[in-house]
């Protein structure tokens, strides 16, 4: 689905260290991948490369077999949707309904069909009761859920969540993570979560760890958590449950609360 071959990107030619430094990776269709790293690791730059907002100076990028080029930019962007960190920067419509409908207006569908789709995707993010509300009356978490619905309505093959919970309170964060898990279970989508939060990354099938513009590790969440050197290099905070389980003799470290309780009760 997504393939990078030796991709390098600098914001300025004079930059000694590239923001993305000779990165090669592959993400298969239907995978849920977390791209994990501390501030300045290059993960958000990578997300902008994937949606063709930034062009690599070196290397190759393929989306669904299509190589990135100026000629096929439009085709590539149709395949990928992105939800950004700040919910205030992506609310376009004057109401929730208008915002979800915005992208559908270029798809040549009837008003009735558009309305049906708006309601359908509002339900996915639990915002169907707020369709007439204006953005200033919504919480940050609600705005982020509307942004997710707006992307889902466009039906992209790949959805990128770029630090989508970092500006939310615990309640808003929990709800958005719940929706991401629901999309993973119900939709035939390739999901990419850009995050510095291991609690969010452990939901993924595969974790790609970045530090100083380089891909330094790849594996399952458990594999990554067991690599102390990688945790240190990437400045990742391990989940609370994992930290507890690691210090209990005779218990295999786990980040799943139910697994920890089960092992303790044996």
From Swiss-Prot:
E.C. number(s) listed in UniProt: 7.-.-.-
EC class name: translocase
Record: residues binding ATP: 37-44
Name of a matching Pfam family: ABC_tran
The ABC transporter domain, residue ranges: 2-237
GO-annotated cellular components: ATP-binding cassette (ABC) transporter complex
Gene3D superfamilies: P-loop containing nucleotide triphosphate hydrolases
GO molecular function (one): ATP binding
Entry similarity comment: Belongs to the ABC transporter superfamily. Energy-coupling factor EcfA family.
Function: ATP-binding (A) component of a common energy-coupling factor (ECF) ABC-transporter complex. Unlike classic ABC transporters this ECF transporter provides the energy necessary to transport a number of different substrates.
Subunit-structure text: Forms a stable energy-coupling factor (ECF) transporter complex composed of 2 membrane-embedded substrate-binding proteins (S component), 2 ATP-binding proteins (A component) and 2 transmembrane proteins (T component).
Protein name: Energy-coupling factor transporter ATP-binding protein EcfA1
Primary gene name: ecfA1
């Amino acid at each position: 689905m997504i393939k990078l071959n030796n991709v390098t990107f600098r914001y300025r030619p004079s930059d000694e260290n590239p923001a993305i430094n000779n990165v090669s990776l592959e993400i298969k269709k239907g995978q849920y991948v977390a791209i994990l790293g501390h501030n300045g690791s290059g993960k958000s730059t990578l997300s902008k490369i994937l949606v063709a907002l930034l062009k690599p100076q070196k290397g190759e990028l393929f989306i669904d077999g299509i190589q990135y080029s100026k000629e096929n930019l439009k085709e590539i962007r149709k395949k990928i949707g992105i939800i950004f960190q700040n919910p205030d920067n992506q609310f376009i419509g004057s109401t929730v309904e208008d915002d979800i409908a915005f992208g559908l207006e270029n798809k040549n569908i009837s008003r009735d069909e558009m309305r049906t789709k708006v309601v359908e995707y509002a339900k996915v993010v639990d915002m169907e009761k707020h369709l007439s509300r204006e953005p200033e009356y919504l919480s940050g978490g609600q705005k982020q859920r509307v942004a997710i619905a707006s992307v889902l309505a466009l039906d992209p093959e790949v959805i990128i969540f770029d630090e989508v919970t970092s500006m939310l309170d615990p309640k808003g964060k929990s709800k958005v993570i719940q929706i991401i898990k629901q999309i993973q279970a119900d939709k035939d989508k390739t999901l990419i979560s850009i995050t510095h939060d291991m609690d969010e990354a452990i939901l993924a099938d595969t974790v790609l760890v970045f530090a100083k513009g380089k891909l330094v590790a790849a594996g399952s969440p458990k594999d990554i958590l067991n690599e102390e050197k990688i945790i240190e290099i990437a400045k990742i905070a391990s989940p609370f449950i994992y930290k507890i389980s690691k210090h209990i003799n005779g218990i295999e470290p786990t980040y799943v609360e139910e697994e920890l309780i089960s092992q303790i009760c044996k």
